[in-house]
Amino acid sequence: MTFYRTLVPFYRSQGIDVSVIEGSASWAAEHSNPAEIEGVHVEVLERARLDAWYARFDQYAALPLLRRHLAAAWAMWEQADFGRDFDVVEACDWGLLFVPPAIEASRPLVVQCHGSVGQISVHDPVEGEESCSITLHLLERACIGAAQHIQTLSRANAAFWSAETGREVSAIPPAWIGRSLPDSHPSSGRGLVIGRVQRWKGPQILCEALKRLGDRAPMVDWVGRDTVWGAQQSSSAAHLSAAYPEIWGRKVIQHPQVTSAEVAARQQAALFNLVPSTWDVFNFTAVEAMASGRPTIVSTGAGASDLIEDGVNGFLFPSGDAEALASVLDRILTESAEKLTEIGRAAQETVRSALNPEKIAKQRIAAYRAAIHDFAQRPRVPLSGWLGDICRPAQSSSNEMAFLEGFPLRQIVKHAAQRTSRRIWR
């Protein structure tokens, strides 16, 4: 919904109505709760529908996460009446939500690549999910390659999916409407990161850079919730505290999530804003930071780095390079206040012009019309064969846990005991 909010007024001015179904493998509601939100018809995935499709995918009992993603994708496609009332369908890559419309090929389709489950599993692997991740990589590559039109938000992600699929992938950045900023705040004298404490968001790169700076290292506030690090029940914050005890909790201070208004106030008061991600399809907080008027440092691993000209409207450093980040921090700490203000103002002008909603809306509408025209000229047929079979429900099994027969009983009992113990003492 957030992605479309800034575009809807321009869509409606062209007579385009937008309907959105919100949902995923982990998000559904008892009822669809239809509502009109800022001119968009919004529904929520129905839990009973998700559960019904989950039961039909029992061939993936050994891969419950994949099973739930496919179930959610088909449940949402069914709830949308398989796209029958729509001129064009836009489906997200995350959670395999694009798979049903891609393989059914019954409506014009644009796949919007915001960051797929398979991509995330590469940049943030979790113990025990390796088999699911490998399967997701294969399915995403094959099914995105079969989609009619493919879009994403940054040049780097377009290049990634083009290399994986051999298809043309267009890059259209998100739209941005500048909001009124709060009254000017005195500089906090501290750096600021907005985002989850997560491996691919780059907290370890920041810690390493600050460690290299020693006594010159600035204080940095990190605003965002904790996530797992490498294993379920783990903590990224705990990992960083153990790996960098002199930095995490001393030089980098974690804060819980705050409101968007508080984010804007913090960004406007920061000495600098930082996006240290080792990978990010785009990272919208970079745009918000640039709009604040304060200098913004962005890793080349984040797609939003497309907007930055180093030293002109912000600062860049190579993805994962702590030494380079330390050099940029040193550069900012020794730069004049006047120069930093000039760079911040240039960043504000960049996001106003490059992400102008009317301009972005025209590009997206042109892509929708191209998909509709292409579909009319070259109708597609549903995918069959192995790929089609893999992505659709299979014949029900009388014993969906039969895959456990391939494991030694001793291992099963040991794992069950350990899992029970963890639940008791949690």
Go through each PLM region and give its residues:
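Short hydrophobic beta-strand element within catalytic cores of glycosyltransferases
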Residues: 295-298
